[in-house]
């Protein structure tokens, strides 16, 4: 990146985090029955989100109603009678996505396992892998990590704020990120997936491994694998421990369990996608002089080589998503993270590869990293490896004041 480009990115970062004026002056587990909906009155905002969980600005009344209906569905509780299980990780979406507001992440982890032998990853699908569900509708169906597994990984639930904007970023922009030359041995490659929602080959961008390309596919994947509800996109139930007898014994609801409501033409997964699509990105925190200085350190250290500050959505019939700048701080590419990888192959991602996590709202999601191993931002940086090793080392060589400036900046975005 040239000096001119670095200055441009720095100015863009500062402008996006609301510093134009400053710069001018300075340089689970409740298994109750499926609850009746509570309808939420959501005020249509006229400016950017002011708190976590707000809807996007510029939504139409119809879009805002879809957001509210999606929010209700997101909080609904499933039971065995409605299709829950036979194995599952929780009974509702909100159970794992509530911090610091509905649509956020949580400290709840899911367990992934597999076996690596002779350089090949086996998800042990015949034993229920690679995802182990923590709960079952009957104890005899309970899953465990099989003895054959030699890789076990934990993954936190991810925050959903701003995902509509990320969905609206064109594939071409992500491909361009991969093609742009990068220093420090950083490469990065797009996750090319078959999108079950459209049937098209797309660039994945959702999930720790960028394994889904659209919010509808992301919703359907989670509804099946986290709650055990089949849908038109994912119609095949998970067999407990891969045992088809157990599946026949405990799965009594006809598939797909997520049926389309004839009154609205929408199934639950459509409502989940509406909620995520119209959920605003994290609000910006107030800025300090230290955070302003930290923007420059962010660039100088090389963080922006992967955590790209800005991308832009393509044209859209949805005004709130139409040609918007997206300060996500991610290139949405897969990178070989060395020891920081989780050891699980998924989609097109190799065991050591992880998607660059967007940094917006970072201050609200400790502990950090995919498995929550880092209690602080500083610890998370120091645990970077693989392609990020040189940038990590550059950070460790900063003096304490520069490190604090960078940390203050990261807490502000």
Predicted segments with their positions:
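Bacterial N-terminal signal peptides that target proteins for export
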Residues: 2-9
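Periplasmic c-type cytochrome electron-transfer domains
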Residues: 6, 20-413
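Bacterial N-terminal signal peptides
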Residues: 10-18
């Amino acid at each position: 990146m040239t000096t001119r480009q670095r200055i441009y990115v720095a100015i863009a970062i500062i402008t996006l985090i609301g510093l134009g004026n400053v710069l001018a002056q300075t340089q689970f587990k409740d298994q109750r029955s499926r609850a009746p909906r509570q309808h939420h009155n959501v005020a249509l905002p006229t400016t950017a989100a002011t708190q976590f969980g707000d809807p996007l600005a510029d939504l139409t009344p119809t879009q805002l109603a879809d957001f509210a209906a999606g929010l209700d569905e997101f909080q609904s509780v499933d039971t065995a009678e409605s299709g829950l299980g036979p194995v599952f990780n929780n009974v509702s979406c909100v159970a794992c996505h509530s911090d610091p507001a509905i649509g956020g992440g949580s400290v709840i982890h899911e367990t992934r396992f597999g076996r690596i032998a002779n350089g090949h990853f086996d998800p042990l699908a015949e034993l229920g892998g690679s995802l182990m569900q923590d709960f079952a509708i009957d104890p005899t169906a309970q899953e465990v990590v099989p003895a054959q597994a030699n890789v076990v990984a934990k993954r936190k639930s991810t925050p959903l704020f701003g995902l509509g904007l990320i969905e609206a970023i064109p594939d071409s922009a992500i491909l361009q990120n991969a093609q742009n030359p990068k220093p420090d041995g950083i490469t990065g490659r797009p996750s090319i997936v078959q999108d079950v929602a459209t049937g098209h080959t797309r660039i994945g961008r959702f999930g720790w491994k960028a394994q889904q390309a659209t919010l509808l596919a992301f919703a359907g994947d989670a509804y099946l694998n986290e709650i055990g509800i089949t849908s038109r996109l994912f119609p095949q139930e998970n067999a407990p421990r891969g045992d088809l007898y157990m599946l026949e014994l405990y799965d009594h609801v006809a598939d797909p369990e997520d049926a389309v409501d004839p009154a609205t033409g929408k199934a639950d997964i459509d409502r989940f996608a509406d909620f995520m699509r119209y959920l605003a990105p994290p609000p910006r925190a107030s800025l300090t002089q230290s955070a302003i200085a930290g923007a420059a350190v962010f660039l100088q250290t090389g963080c922006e080589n992967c955590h790209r500050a800005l991308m832009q959505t393509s044209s859209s019939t949805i005004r709130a998503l139409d040609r918007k700048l997206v300060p996500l701080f991610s290139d949405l590419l897969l990178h070989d993270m060395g020891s920081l990888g989780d050891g699980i192959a998924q989609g097109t991602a190799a065991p050591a590869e992880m998607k660059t996590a967007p940094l917006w709202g970072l201050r609200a999601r400790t502990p950090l990293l995919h498995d929550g191993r880092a209690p602080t931002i500083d610890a998370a940086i120091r645990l970077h490896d693989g392609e990020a090793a040189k940038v990590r080392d550059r950070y460790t060589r900063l003096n304490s004041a520069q490190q604090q400036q960078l940390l203050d900046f990261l807490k502000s975005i």
